[in-house]
Swiss-Prot record:
Family: Belongs to the steroid 5-alpha reductase family.
Name of this protein: Trans-2,3-enoyl-CoA reductase-like
Major location category of this protein: membrane
GO cellular component labels: endoplasmic reticulum; membrane
Amino acid sequence: MFKRHKSLASERRRELISRGATRSILKDDMKNFHFLSQFILSAGPLKSTSAVKHSKTIHFEIEILDAQTKKQICIVDKVTQKSTIHDVKQKFHKACPQWYPSRVGLQLERGGPFLKDNLTIQSVAASSIVTLYFTDLGQQVSWTTVFLAEYTGPLLIYLLFYLRIPYIYNMKESSRRLCHPVVHLACFCHCIHYIRYLLETLFVHKVSSGHTSLKNLLKSCAFYWGFTSWIAYYINHPRYTPPSFGYRQVAISAINFLICEAGNHFINVVLSHPSHTGNNACFPSPNYNPFTWMFFLVSCPNYTYEIGSWISFTIMTQTLPVGIFTLLMSIQMSLWAKKKHKIYLKKFSSYMHRKSAMIPFIL
């Protein structure tokens, strides 16, 4: 009897323990479910995973050799296909700091043309390894510096001769002889010409961001400054002889000079701005300004007006140095005009055959 009660008591105890364990498990499950639901709600709505696009980037290895000795200077690696020659020059400058980018000339072949900075590596590469030849271009200066030096020099040099500073002319002769009115007019026209050049260089022309060698700067300055000194010396000399036909010759040539200067300015304004279509490659077209109607006759009216200015200045002053300078400038500008005219013919052949390069119906 005692054993039976003992067994019943033990069974009763097991039943209570199992019920308590079940309740504790249920409580734990409820807590876990509540925590899981709160976590899902805080995570927000499920987003569909987008497919990851794997773009294969091609890298090039640029081997740079000396153009004279063919010795390897450096290797520029990890160059992408969209990188330009200018980017290669920048990396080359980091490897060789003594050569800054504007001084570096890169060629595909020895003696070949220098690669332009805007060319991409993909356009010149035949394989993943590209060999380029390096040439030191020497000391470089910007084109803006070249133009400012070319035009500032003649402006100041002419004024020095016009003021008849000492040690240029005989002081006694200079004080005795008065300047002819054409001398003052010539100084005015000469100053207007080069002041216009300077202002257009700073505010009108879209000067290239490229560079040129210091030798080219010295050559250009020697040409312009030297001829200006020669011209100014003769025109401002105390023994200067006025034009043969007097004031009528001076007045007509001066008016024509000012007309050509105005026309040159308006043409440069048209050339510096894109066309109404927004395409810089389009042939520049005339507008409502009568000075721009010269585009109907010639491809390069800016050279036409420039030569017209110097011919007028030659007639107005009637001096040999101005005539020689005008002749040389005419030859040079005719070569530039023919070259540009050929480019226009290739691009706009149906429209350009009826035009001349610089002089209407002649050249």
